[in-house]
Swiss-Prot record:
Gene3D superfamilies in alphabetical order: Calcium-transporting ATPase, cytoplasmic domain N (3.40.1110.10), Calcium-transporting ATPase, cytoplasmic transduction domain A (2.70.150.10), HAD superfamily/HAD-like (3.40.50.1000)
Residues modified as Phosphoserine: 102, 551
The protein's name: Phospholipid-transporting ATPase NEO1
Outcome when changing residue 488 to A: Localization to the Golgi apparatus appears normal
Chain intervals for the UniProt region annotation (Disordered): 1-21, 73-95
Membrane topology: Multi-pass membrane protein
Enzymatic class: translocase
Deleted gene: phenotype: Inviable; simultaneous knockout of ANY1 rescues inviability.
CDD domains assigned: P-type_ATPase_APLT_Neo1-like
Organism: Saccharomyces cerevisiae (strain ATCC 204508 / S288c) (Baker's yeast)
GO cellular component, one term: plasma membrane
């Protein structure tokens, strides 16, 4: 790498205190630091200069940097580890960069956090080694040019200057999902096709015809089949790409009003820093920071179903600092600092600054991500912060892994055997000829070309088209409505599933939550005793206006105490949530990220305390008994996330001027936050055994002084651009999350989905081992497993929980090695221990168990389990789920199934197949999986039989011609045989089925046979090889016997043998059909008629006069009888002696 420019020799040019001189002496250049450079500079500190660079000396709209101790730059590389250690205790300010410089003085640095110093003696040189070169013209006078990139560093945005001066600094916002362009389409597609052995083999065969010594017959005989395959594939790809381009064009040309430019421009032309106005129903064109909303509260709702698959509306709020600013102030007087682009849609760090003095933090609540939709009425004004491939939507769009079905792998193995047969047969025929000339290797090559039909070029096209047929049949099956096939390459794998990994909530259960029980330590209330709770809630308003002792409600001392406790519990439940009431067409609906929260709000409504109004600053509750409202000011909200497993809120009671911190969450985390008690763990277990999802409710009263101290430290932490979440969490823990008053416990019921019990029983009888992987508690998972019939009545459940030591994990396996009929129940902590230390030993045992239930699983553990089962067993694994936490597991499966549920469409969008209910899985596997696998297996073998039989005819003819490699069928005959004369009847096998649909559910054991792969195996393949050898030999030998090999009779022999070949294939298809339908009958008759009609046009190949004689028809009949009758007889006898299971079932079911 070239040496970096010398800063010392040019420091006067770079950092001159006179800004005008600085602007004249330094050409425009950009210094961008990539992620690696940031990491290297994290440990840099300047020993003698606590403030190395500061941003000041503003001249008009231009700002520049002053280097106070410029010589320190030259000393960077000379600092020893000792000097670094001395400076480690010195407070240093982070280097700041500025994006407002003009093009003439655009020198920028990124933030460099203070961290422990590096021990390197030349750390600055190492840091500079990560720099890249971008502007050779402007850096040429400093030595080697340097390129730096702004794409992956923190960015500072000024609406008045960034879109103008930095227009080329950030990526374009033009959307492009097209795979090809006019130049790359043909070469790219040809490469993709010819990397497959099939197509490359036939290309070589076709090209060989350009060599005179290898030329056999007509060039079209070899070019046309390959061209047909490529044309079908290229047409399909072209249509798909044109549709992608059309969708891209529509999105790119959507107009948006840009305030900073005072005109409407297409989405593709938006730049970072543009202020745009978005109206209700508009798609968000880029990642935006919400600055203003037409709602006085600054609130806006967005739909994120196209981003994360969740169907509920998300609340977004405008920055308070900018909500009431004029458009002129928004353009000229604010700046936005945004963190580097990243994938997480739930995380954003930034701040907005007004007049270079007042700042407000920015979080994900202030963002509008690209590809979401503004749902609330009115409009909003937002600033573009990320464009194009830097947006969250683009960064989370990954190219789906191309899945290859097991059947394709098996066919590929068989094709290799066929290829070996071609080589062996070619060498054998030349050997029989005695290698009589010096050009024997040319004869081998000519035989390879003649026998190329053994590897059928049309096999891939037939299978691909068949998959499309299966997908159409699945999507149009009225018994499983709204099913979507997203991956059409693996429908056959639906018939080979041996392991089913399922989520619980929303998959086996309805995800329709109802709060069934609340427990207050000494007493619990259920849905049957809600009237008692309602009575207590009635006293809520009077007890707030007057003291409870003066209340008109006469209560005993015990009931007074209980009234207080119930009141506090219900009031906390009504306040501590993120639910927002919305009105669409005068209908009240609740919007929330979790159905649990909606269930809780509906429960408080049922007992007389309903959510009346909520915005970002306040929440109002309606006391239905008195008609009065209870108003609370929302001071801070701490949303739920999968890491914290809790949510909290700070409110001020406007009537009593009291400050309260309220929190609810999982028992595993809340037990450490609430005051010590002797009942929480026991009651949590009791509720879980009832199948209820539990939440622990607590609260804490704050005095105003403590709250103000918390707010100050929390605000300071929220402005940090380094480890913001960690700093904020530390402040919350310090002031809030300890010694909470334990109010009670809620139990929410999630009912089983329709027909889950019968579906699981069917799948287990079909030989599928079912695992349930859930993030819920052990007791809840156990209860749901029993009710869903995952665990049979009386079946022993071996429980492994809280295993934290490797030796303890190993000892737990001993029992399971002995009792293979037991069910395993394991928690995530123990599972993690096995995955880390005893993966091989653990899965060697548990893959044989009928049922495994894993609780408290993380999304990554779910994915790991799927991957390990696939690796260890080699069996097909199906994963099914409905939530975002199931996506990893679904994508790691051989077959991923997503359920469109109340958690949204994220799992559905990531899956290979999307269904609406778990019970639809039985239809998908037992019926469509069976048909897809058996049909494709038969289709593949028929296509190979079609190629083998014509190759056998060619081999017999070559042997009878004294081992001369002369083509038997040439030109159109070769092309027509594989297309017009046999393709439609053979392909009609994709409509066949060997058993009625209803019987697949009555006898699910039939599915177990499919997993053994008997429909396409080496055994069945060799049966078809022998069949082809017999029929091909009969057709060719008898055709030659009825005519001769003389040139005058050659066309007669070809006429009778080719006709026999075509009719034989049509009859074989008819014999293999189990259930006839109109389409099959039409294809058989139409194909035969087409051949008959085309015969008069084949005078170049046939002796047409001979085809009108009685001898011709007599000979044809004899050939067909000898070719077909023995095969039909053998098949009938075998079926009588060894009837297949489906035949027994079909016969038994037929009245």
């Amino acid at each position: 790498m070239p040496n970096p420019p010398s800063f010392k020799s040019h420091k006067q040019n770079l950092f001159n205190s006179n800004n005008n001189q600085h602007a004249n002496s330094v050409d425009s250049f950009d210094l961008h630091l990539d992620d690696s450079f940031d990491a290297a500079l994290d440990s840099l500190q300047i020993n003698n200069n606590p403030e190395p660079l500061s941003k000041h000396n503003t001249v008009g709209d231009r700002e520049s940097f002053e280097m106070r101790t410029v010589d320190d730059l030259d000393n960077f590389s000379n600092h020893s580890s000792d000097s670094h250690r001395k400076s480690s205790n010195t407070d240093t300010h982070p280097l700041m960069y500025d994006n407002r410089l003009s093009q003439d003085d655009n020198f920028k640095f990124t933030n460099i956090a203070s961290s422990p110093p590096s021990s390197s003696n030349n750390i600055f040189s190492k840091a500079l080694s990560y720099l890249k070169v971008s502007n050779t013209k402007n850096w040429s006078k400093f030595g080697s040019p340097i390129e730096l990139s702004d794409q992956h560093i923190e960015r500072e945005i000024h609406p008045d200057t960034t879109p103008v001066y930095d227009r080329n600094r950030y990526v374009s916002n033009e959307l492009s999902n097209a795979k090809y362009n006019a130049v790359t389409f043909v070469p790219t597609l040809l490469y993709e096709q010819f990397k497959f052995f099939y197509n490359l083999y036939f290309l070589v065969v076709a090209l060989s015809q350009a060599v005179p010594a290898l030329r056999i017959g007509y060039l079209s005989s070899y070019i046309v089949p390959l061209a047909f395959v490529l044309t079908v594939t290229m047409a399909k790809e072209a249509i798909d790409d044109i549709q992608r381009r059309r969708r891209d064009r529509e999105s790119n040309n959507e107009l948006y009003h840009v305030i900073t430019r005072n005109r409407s421009i297409p989405s593709k032309d938006l730049k970072v820093g543009d202020l745009i106005k978005v109206h209700k129903g508009d798609r968000i064109p880029a990642d935006l920071v919400l600055l203003q909303s037409s709602e006085p509260s600054g609130e806006s709702f967005i739909k994120t179903d196209q981003l994360d698959g969740e169907t509920d509306w998300k609340l977004r709020v405008a920055c308070p600092l900018t909500q009431n600013l004029s458009e002129n102030d928004l353009i000229n007087r604010i700046s936005i600092t945004a963190s580097a682009p990243e994938k997480s849609i739930h995380k954003f760090l930034g701040k907005v600054t007004y007049k270079d003095s007042t700042s407000n933090p920015l979080s994900v609540d202030n963002t509008l991500w690209a590809n979401t939709v503004l749902a609330s009425s009115g409009f909003c004004i937002a600033c573009v912060v990320y464009t194009g491939r830097d947006t969250r939507q683009a960064m989370n769009t990954t190219t789906a892994k191309v899945k290859t079905g097991l059947l394709e792998l098996e066919i590929n193995s068989i094709s290799k055997i066929l290829c070996a047969c071609v080589f062996a047969l070619s060498i054998l025929l030349v050997a029989f000829a005695g290698f009589h000339n010096d050009d024997w290797y040319i004869d081998i090559l000519r035989y390879l070309i003649l026998f190329s039909t053994i590897i059928p070029v049309s096999l891939r096209v037939n299978l691909d088209l068949a998959k499309s047929v299966y997908a159409h049949q699945i999507e149009h099956d009225k018994t499983i409505p709204e099913t979507i096939v997203r991956t059409s390459t693996i429908p056959e794998d639906l018939g080979r599933i041996e392991y089913l990994l399922s989520d619980k909530t929303g998959t086996l259960t309805q995800n329709d939550m109802q709060l069934k029980k609340i427990h207050l330590g000494t007493v619990s209330y259920t849905s049957e005793t809600l009237d008692i709770v309602s009575d207590y809630v009635q006293s809520l308003v009077s007890s707030k206006n007057d003291s409870l002792n003066n209340s008109k409600v006469a209560l005993s001392t015990t009931r007074k105490d209980m009234s207080f406790r119930v009141r506090d519990m219900i009031l906390t439940l009504a306040i501590c949530h993120n639910v927002t009431p919305t009105f669409e067409d005068d209908e009240l609906t609740y919007q929330a990220a979790s159905p649990d929260e909606i269930a809780i709000v509906k429960f408080t409504e049922s007992v007389g305390l309903s959510l009346f109004k909520r915005d970002r600053h306040s929440i109002s509750l309606l006391h239905e008994h008195s008609g009065k409202t209870l108003n609370y000011e929302i001071l801070q909200v701490f949303p739920f996330n999968s890491d914290s497993k809790r949510m909290g809120i700070i409110v001020r009671d406007e009537q009593l001027d009291e400050y309260w911190f309220m929190q609810k969450g999982a028992d595993t985390v809340m037990s450490k936050i609430v005051e010590s008690n002797d009942w929480l763990e026991e009651e949590t277990g009791n509720m879980a055994r009832e199948g209820l999802r539990t939440l622990v409710i607590g609260r804490k009263k704050l005095n105003k002084k403590i709250y103000e101290q918390f707010q100050k430290e929390y605000n300071d932490a929220s402005l940090s651009m380094l480890n913001r979440d960690q700093q904020m969490s530390q402040v919350i823990t310090k002031y809030l999350e300890h010694d909470l008053e334990l109010l009670g416990l809620t139990g929410v019921e999630d009912k089983l989905q329709k027909d889950v019990k019968s579906s699981i029983e069917l799948l287990r009888n079909a030989g599928i081992k079912i695992w349930m992987l859930t993030g819920d508690k052990v007791e809840t998972a156990r209860c749901v497993s029993i009710s869903a019939k995952l665990i049979s009545r009386g079946q022993y459940v071996h429980t492994i929980t809280k295993v934290t030591r490797p030796e303890g994990a190993f000892n737990q396996l001993e029992y399971l090695k002995i009792n293979r009929n037991a069910c395993l129940l394991i928690d995530g902590e123990s599972l993690g221990m096995f995955l880390k230390h005893y993966e091989q030993e653990f899965f060697d045992v548990v893959v044989h168990l009928p049922t495994v239930i894993a609780c408290r699983c993380t999304p990554q553990q779910k994915a790991d389990v799927a991957l390990v089962i696939r690796k260890m067993t080699g069996k097909r694994v199906c994963c099914i789920g409905d939530g975002g936490n199931d996506v990893s597991m679904i994508q790691c499966a051989d077959v991923g199934v997503g359920i469109v549920g109340k958690e949204g469409k994220q799992a559905s969008l990531a899956a290979d197949f999307s269904i609406t209910q778990f019970c639809h899985l039985t239809e998908l596997l037992l019926w469509h999986g069976r048909n897809s696998y058996k049909r494709s297996a038969k289709l593949a073998q028929f296509v190979m039989h079609r190629g083998l039989i014509i190759a056998i005819c060619q081999a017999v003819y070559s042997i009878c011609s004294l081992f001369e490699p002369i083509a038997l069928y040439q030109g159109w005959l070769m092309v027509g045989y594989a297309t017009c004369y046999t393709m439609a009847p053979v392909f009609s096998l994709t409509l066949d089925h060997d058993i009625e649909e209803s019987l697949t559910k009555i006898y699910p054991e039939l599915y177990k046979e499919l997993t053994e792969g008997k429909s396409l195996s080496y055994k069945t393949f060799f049966v078809w090889v022998l069949l082809s050898l017999f029929q091909g030999s009969v057709i060719q030998l008898f055709s030659q016997a009825f005519t001769s090999l003389l040139d005058t009779d050659f066309t007669r022999m070809v006429a009778i043998s080719f006709t026999a070949l075509v009719v034989n294939e049509l009859i074989m298809v008819a014999l293999e059909i189990y259930t006839w339908n109109k389409t099959m009958l039409v294809t058989e008759i139409a194909t035969l008629l087409f051949y008959i009609v085309s015969v008069p046009f084949l005078g170049d190949y046939f002796d047409l006069g001979y085809m009108t004689t009685v001898n011709y028809y007599a000979g044809l009949l004899v050939i067909l009888l000898i070719s077909i009758f023995p095969v039909w007889t053998a098949k009938a006898i075998y079926r009588r002696l060894h009837p297949p299971s489906y035949a027994k079932v079909q016969e038994f079911a037929t009245p």
